[in-house]
């Protein structure tokens, strides 16, 4: 099954931002063996057996989160400075414009084209990790037939990050489907996708809701 990149400029930018955070706080080359762990979470809503919307969440590990947040805090108050945050993110996006770190989707050679419905949002998780939320919808002009198996993956072609699902036992939350079929999450150990994780999801037409 062939991998296809989600055609979403917004998602690309937020992914570039997270990878750039790592590049800015660590001196090691981005194009090297893994230096950190990136966790991914997905919520997919189906309509008529097809993916309709996708909500994505990316979480950096604690070491990268701590050093990135230190760059955003006001040295006097200790609070995150809004102006510093905006300048920081803008600079990182420019620096890392050529890095493609994306969540991918594929189904029998057909691309799932996603478009952003809103600007990505930064957040600080309860455990102190730094992350990004994004909401996407399927471009219906490229919608595929129902009943196929969709492969959702989380990977970093630069090999800076090792990818994990936030909840490996239930990597994807599926709604709009009465009885979805999910395969166990798979971690790729070798080859060009080493360090990535993926999961297969299917919503049969007889299960439409």
Language model features: what each stretch is:
Residues 102-209:
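Mature, soluble, non-transmembrane domains
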Residues 51-66, 130-138:
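Short, well-ordered beta-strand segments enriched in hydrophobic/aromatic residues
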Residues 71-82:
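Acidic, glycine-anchored loop motifs typical of Ca2+
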Residues 3-18:
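Bacterial N-terminal signal peptides that target proteins for export
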């Amino acid at each position: 099954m062939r991998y296809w990149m989600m055609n979403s400029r917004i998602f690309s930018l937020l992914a570039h931002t997270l990878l750039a955070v790592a590049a800015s706080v660590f001196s090691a080359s981005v194009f090297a063996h893994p230096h950190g762990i990136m966790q991914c979470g997905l919520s997919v809503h189906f309509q008529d057996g097809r993916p309709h919307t996708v909500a994505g969440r990316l979480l950096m590990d604690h070491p990268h989160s701590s050093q990135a947040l230190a760059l955003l805090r006001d040295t006097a108050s200790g609070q995150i400075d809004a102006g510093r945050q905006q300048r920081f993110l803008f600079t990182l996006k420019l620096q890392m414009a050529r890095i493609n770190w994306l969540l991918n989707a594929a189904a029998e050679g057909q691309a799932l084209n996603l478009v952003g419905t809103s600007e990505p949002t930064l957040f600080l998780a309860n455990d102190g990790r730094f992350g990004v939320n994004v909401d996407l919808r399927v471009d219906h002009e490229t919608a595929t037939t129902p009943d196929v198996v969709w492969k959702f993956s989380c990977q970093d072609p630069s090999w800076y990050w090792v990818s994990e699902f936030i909840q490996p036992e239930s990597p994807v939350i599926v709604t709009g489907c009465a009885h979805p079929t999910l395969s166990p999450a798979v971690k790729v150990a070798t080859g060009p996708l080493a360090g990535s994780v993926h999961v297969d999801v299917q919503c049969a037409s007889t299960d439409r809701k």
